[in-house]
Amino acid sequence: MKKIILLGATGSIGTQTLAIIRENPEKFQIVALSFGRNMERGRAIIKEFKPKMVAVWHTRDRVILEAEFPNVKFFNGLEGLREVATYLDGDVLLNAVMGSVGLLPTLDAIEAGKAIAIANKETLVTAGHLVMRAAKEKNISLLPVDSEHSAILQALNGENTERIEKLVLTASGGSFRDKTREQLSEVTVKEALKHPNWNMGNKLTIDSATMFNKGLEVMEAHWLFGVDYDDIEVVIQRESIIHSMVQFVDGSFIAQLGTPDMRMPIQYALTYPDRLYIPYEKEFRITDFSALHFEKVDYERFPALKLAYNAGKIGGTMPTVLNAANEIAVAGFLNGQVAFYNIEALVENAMNRHTSISDPDLDTILQVDQETRAYVKTLL
């Protein structure tokens, strides 16, 4: 039985992870977890899964829960996340928190010898060189939870990675894929949160609409698979049936197909290289799709993706700036402070004023992250 530490238990990935564990109690046990502010959902999870250790964000929530669950050890804040991530009894850390707050817990878990299932792409975006170096030194497996990277991992199974011609990441195009740049000036938060194919959290859904999410995934793929940015291509695949592909030097492609359901890559990360049965409401049949559609990305329509490629190629602290600026800009949009079409402009502004620092250490990354957030907040 694998003992799981789950960071971000009440979020979209966390909820679907718990569904898998609920279906397979003989294979998995939740021994520690974290959640943010959703106390009602968090209480229910603690009651059902009976973790031994829990981290919440606020001190007041920790105090309340300590009184309700005297047999559980509680922590709070970033230090709480770090405590939970290194819980001695855990085998696998599944990091499903949103944002760069996931970086330090991941590094701590690697140092503690945990296997890592990574859904927190910001960890690799901001500090991929540090994370991959630490994982290599500790001989730790780093398995992707994102559907695109899981698809690539499956396509590469047994293949010689030196024979890769390029990686092809697929994208749905998000909520506004059929709108022009001019039409984006009037879109609302409610409209932006209606993703055509996937059920995701708010921040991730907005990132999908701007294509910043795909940009972060390009950087994640660069680190996970050691492929140059010029050899990573993004294409629009409207149906979200082909989750990603690998092209090899002989011109052949290997793709992974399936229903757009995050339980598939989650279970693969937890069971790799094995697989589990997943009960779907509707069986996936390839014959239900008379055609699959592919489109080139229009970088004028989706400037966020171009910014992400530029940040990745510049390297150093520039990806940290892009990520931090985007997190603040998206929060501003969700709170009604920023128009949707201004999200990219805020990120570009932050990148233009920053001189990248090459091969940054952890302290430098954290400092640049905080400085960028503070700067972008002044622009809201």
Curated annotation (Swiss-Prot):
Cofactor(s) listed in the protein's UniProt record: Mg(2+); Mn(2+)
Highest taxon in the source lineage: Bacteria
Catalytic reaction equation(s): 2-C-methyl-D-erythritol 4-phosphate + NADP(+) = 1-deoxy-D-xylulose 5-phosphate + NADPH + H(+)
One MF annotation (Gene Ontology) recorded for this entry: 1-deoxy-D-xylulose-5-phosphate reductoisomerase activity
Binding site for 1-deoxy-D-xylulose 5-phosphate: 121, 147-148, 172, 195, 208, 213-214, 217
General function of this protein: Catalyzes the NADPH-dependent rearrangement and reduction of 1-deoxy-D-xylulose-5-phosphate (DXP) to 2-C-methyl-D-erythritol 4-phosphate (MEP).
Family: Belongs to the DXR family.
The protein, known as: 1-deoxy-D-xylulose 5-phosphate reductoisomerase
Organism from which the protein derives: Listeria monocytogenes serotype 4b (strain CLIP80459)
